[in-house]
Amino acid sequence: MRQGSYLTLTLLLLIFGSAAVEAGPDYQLEIRDASNQLITHFPLQHGHWCLHWRHSVTGIAVEDCYRTEAGQMQLSHSWQPDFAAGLGHFEGRGTLVSHPQGGYLIESINEPVPGNGLWIRVGSESVAHTLISADTHLNLSQLAAGQRLRLQLISTKH
C-alpha cells in the first residue's frame, strides 16, 4: 500500500472512529410521571447507573446500582451502611460482605428488573433521590419531590 493510501485510511479511521465515540451511550433511562408524561431522559454510560438517596427515617445514605446485560436492566449491587427499616439482605439474593467505607454491600444480586423499568416514589430534597452514571448526576428530588416516577430502560440504537 502506498504512503498516500495509509494517510487516507488513517484519516478515515480518525473521522469515523471519533464519530462513533461521540455518538453517545447505547442506553438511557426515560423518566415519566404517573400520568405517563415524559419528564426527561438520563443517559447511561456503559449501561451502568446508580440510584442514591438518604433513608427517610434514619437519614443514612443508600445506593442501589444497576447494569444493562443483553438489553435487560439488572439490579447489580446495593450498599447499605445500616439495615434500617425496609433494608437488608435476603438469603439467596446476592452475597453479603462488609463495605470498605462501612456498612454492608450486597454484591452479585444480578436480579432482572421486570419490564426493564421500575417505579419510585421520589422523596423530599432531604432524601435526595439522585441518579448517577459516570460523571452525570440528576437529582430527582429537586425535579419531582413527592411524585411517583417510572424509570424505564430505553435503547438509543436505531
What are the language-model segments listed below?
Residues 26-89:
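N-terminal secretory signal peptides
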Residues 1-8:
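Bacterial N-terminal signal peptides that target proteins for export
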